[in-house]
Amino acid sequence: PIPSRGLGDVYKRQILLTIGFGLLAYSLSTFADERKDRSLIFWRSLPVSDLTTVLSKVLLVVLVVPLMVIPHIILLQLVAMISASIFFTTNDIVSFGWLWGSYILTDWFRIVFSLWAQALWSLPLFVWLMLAGTYATRPIAGAIIPPVVLIVLERIIFKTNTVLEFIENRVGFWSRADSFPKEYNEIRVVDISDIFLLFSSQAFWIGIFASMVIIAGIVYVLSL
């Protein structure tokens, strides 16, 4: 299983970064673009609640997009495995059967689980960007200025960096290190068992609660 796991881990950061930037851009622009082209008025004329509209966009970010990358994952890993097979076979480094005896299919799903875990971990950022797109004339400024003000005020008044640390943690990759920094300090593709670890993390549920509050704010702004 070593070759396949190694290839999967190599893909992890590239895939997470690519999808992550795409989701951040989508989250920031989705409601902002609808306000600009007036399509928001059309959607509000449909018999669909604002909450349903917001949740559909959140589910797209968290669940649907990770599934859309499966074909790309399969293609990339097959190309890498074929290339490695040719190289190893011609150089008598490792047997062809041992290389393809790795858990390729398992790795594909592990990467998808990694994307799901990361999307849930970074959900507060996604919904915050959506909120900025609903009320701010300049969404980028609306997304950046309020957190900066909170960070500065917290530092001046309380001499702490809770807000800054929260944002830094959500921007970074989630790993076992976020729950057990001493015992598990590696960054790797998430195993299915890590999902249960994520769900048992207090920091995860704090993020989910913050996301729910922000989603409520989005629904309120849309209803105005």
What spans do the regions from the language model cover?
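Hydrophobic/aromatic residues in alpha-helical transmembrane segments
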Residues: 24-27, 39, 128, 218-221
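Helix-loop-helix units of permease transmembrane domains in multi-pass membrane transporters
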Residues: 30-60
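Juxtamembrane non-transmembrane "cap" segments at the membrane-aqueous interface
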Residues: 82-93, 160-185
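Residue-level hotspots within the lipid-embedded alpha helices of multi-pass solute transporters
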Residues: 30, 115-122, 207-211
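Junction motif at the cytosolic side of a transmembrane helix
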Residues: 129-141, 193-224
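Membrane-embedded or membrane-proximal helical elements that form or frame transporter/channel pores
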Residues: 4-36, 185-209
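Secretory targeting signals
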Residues: 5, 9-23, 56-130, 134
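Central hydrophobic cores of alpha-helical transmembrane segments
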Residues: 126, 140-153
